[in-house]
Amino acid sequence: MHRKHLQEIPDQSGNVTTSFTWGWDSSKTSELLSGMGVSALEKEEVDSENIPHGLLSNLGHPQSPPRKRVKGKGSDKDFVIIRRPKLSRENFPGVSWDSLPDELLLGIFSCLCLPELLRVSGVCKRWYRLSLDESLWQSLDLAGKNLHPDVTVRLLSRGVVAFRCPRSFMEQPLGESFSSFRVQHMDLSNSVINVSNLHKILSECSKLQNLSLEGLQLSDPIVKTLAQNENLVRLNLCGCSGFSESAVATLLSSCSRLDELNLSWCFDFTEKHVQAAVAHLPNTITQLNLSGYRKNLQKTDLCTIIKRCPNLIRLDLSDSIMLKNDCFPEFFQLNYLQHLSLSRCYDIIPDTLLELGEIPTLKTLQVFGIVPEGTLQLLREALPRLQINCAYFTTIARPTMDSKKNLEIWGIKCRLTLQKPSCL
């Protein structure tokens, strides 16, 4: 065998040009692959999942000539992005959330507690819009929480009607401006809240019917602001301080529909405060608590109370040491009196309490500290019709009774709460 010598490749700089033509006999493909120990791949069917509909139609008609790809002139405008077709909803059984009407979604959202409602509000824009619907925010319970005043304002702006927030902490300054609230029932008892913040919040409340500010530091502007709530029915200012007798007079003169009033134990009340209060009591009051004023409440004040509030059903004058048994005839003028509290009125002689048993409408009598334990049973036997010393605390104008587990506010159960067990 004679080998042919390789020809010298000419220099590129020369004028000689060389062209190579590659060819392959397709019949030898299987022989070559067999020698390599592999086999040829079978021709797969065309995967139409990622191919646009236009190309699919061309694949169905092989006789049609293929489209020539036009080479662009360097411009990006010649490129076209073809989107993958959406999957048919028929592949997914059930009803889509997007097809549910707003009313049905609101009904579902109404079964959620506050943490879950806040969570679903972040799903999409539609759910966020629905989560702000006023029907979901009728009642709110944030008792015992550390709240920023701005957060409280935003929540009230969502249309809250009943707001239960006792023993909470809102000491930070209130910054943003806000509009009027729809709240009608509010409990801020024993909270730590800045006087300025409290004034700003209450100044936007003009529809209050029930309000409890027990134990809070107030001011004359705050008390006068409350006077704009002409529909106020229950007011609890027990243990409050920081306002003058003129503010008390303005408040009671404006709230002409009051039914329950608790002005007990306002520790900076003077004799003038008590006189201003009793002189402006509306005649609609049926439950009144003016206990805790020791020497500042006189018999003359009791006479004024009886005259201005003839429809009293429940009266608490405990810890008024200036009251004696000579004031008993005044109680007989109250034709509807059922519950009377005279605890720790030490100048009342225990034996004279038998006279109160002659009040035909009277049902309960609280005389803690007056009757010794040894003679209490004798008094109960002498007055079998009355329940004596059956309640340690007053319920007048107070929003929540029984225990801290009670989430009601004047009989209204708050639906939105941070407690998980209320969720479905």
From Swiss-Prot:
Keywords: Acetylation, Cytoplasm, Leucine-rich repeat, Nucleus, Phosphoprotein, Repeat, Ubl conjugation, Ubl conjugation pathway. LRR repeats lie at residues 151-176, 177-204, 210-234, 235-257, 258-284, 286-308, 309-330, 334-356, 359-378, 380-401. Residues 94-140 form the F-box domain. It comes from the Eukaryota. A motif (Nuclear localization signal) lies at residues 67-73. Its main location: cytoplasm. GO terms for biological process: cellular response to cell-matrix adhesion; defense response to virus; G1/S transition of mitotic cell cycle; G2/M transition of mitotic cell cycle; innate immune response; positive regulation of double-strand break repair via homologous recombination; positive regulation of intracellular estrogen receptor signaling pathway; positive regulation of protein polyubiquitination. It is found in: Cytoplasm; Nucleus. The keyword Repeat applies. PROSITE patterns: FBOX. One of its GO terms (molecular function) is identical protein binding. Substrate recognition component of a SCF (SKP1-CUL1-F-box protein) E3 ubiquitin-protein ligase complex which mediates the ubiquitination and subsequent proteasomal degradation of target proteins involved in cell cycle progression, signal transduction and transcription. Specifically recognizes phosphorylated CDKN1B/p27kip and is involved in regulation of G1/S transition. Degradation of CDKN1B/p27kip also requires CKS1. Recognizes target proteins ORC1, CDT1, RBL2, KMT2A/MLL1, CDK9, RAG2, NBN, FOXO1, UBP43, YTHDF2, and probably MYC, TOB1 and TAL1. Degradation of TAL1 also requires STUB1. Through the ubiquitin-mediated proteasomal degradation of viral proteins may have an antiviral activity. PANTHER family: PROTEIN ARABIDILLO 1. This is S-phase kinase-associated protein 2. The gene is Skp2.
